[in-house]
UniProtKB/Swiss-Prot annotation:
The gene is Cyct. The keyword Iron applies. Keywords: Acetylation, Apoptosis, Electron transport, Heme, Iron, Metal-binding, Mitochondrion, Phosphoprotein, Respiratory chain, Transport. The lineage of its organism: Eukaryota, Metazoa, Chordata, Craniata, Vertebrata. This is one of two isocytochromes C found in the testis. The other is identical with the form found in other mouse tissues. These cytochromes are assumed to be located in the sperm. SUPFAM superfamilies: Cytochrome c. Belongs to the cytochrome c family. One of its GO terms (cellular component) is mitochondrial intermembrane space. Binds 1 heme c group covalently per subunit. Phosphorylation at Tyr-49 and Tyr-98 both reduce by half the turnover in the reaction with cytochrome c oxidase, down-regulating mitochondrial respiration. GO terms for molecular function: electron transfer activity; heme binding; metal ion binding. Heme c binds at C15, C18, H19, M81. InterPro entries: Cyt_c-like_dom, Cyt_c-like_dom_sf, Cyt_c_1A/1B. GO terms for biological process: apoptotic process; hydrogen peroxide metabolic process; positive regulation of intrinsic apoptotic signaling pathway. This is Cytochrome c, testis-specific.
């Protein structure tokens, strides 16, 4: 499922303006995504989240990211992420494959 190289291109085009992925990377408009998988929503240390994000209480996984990345504002009403989402399932699969590799050791 998914192509990490294609996912990296999607990340650069649609995500990198607001997010970093490397360990110790700085927060931008959005949080650094290192350690994303297995972490609860709203828990990246040092980032100021909305209550909606903190209170959602789901664990980030391939499944939850598939749903979230399709329509972030529907999945977490009140999130400050202004991204409209990625409608194509194959693009979400590629992006998640890339994130899985890029955000963990």
């Amino acid at each position: 499922m998914g192509d990490a190289e294609a996912g990296k291109k999607i990340f650069v085009q649609k995500c990198a303006q607001c997010h970093t992925v490397e360990k110790g990377g700085k927060h931008k408009t959005g949080p650094n995504l290192w350690g994303l998988f297995g972490r609860k929503t709203g828990q990246a240390p040092g980032f100021s989240y909305t209550d909606a994000n903190k209170n959602k209480g789901v664990i980030w996984s391939e499944e939850t990211l598939m749903e979230y990345l399709e329509n972030p504002k529907k999945y977490i009403p009140g999130t400050k992420m202004i991204f409209a989402g990625i409608k194509k399932k194959s693009e979400r699969e590629d992006l998640i494959k890339y994130l899985k590799q890029a955000t963990s050791s």
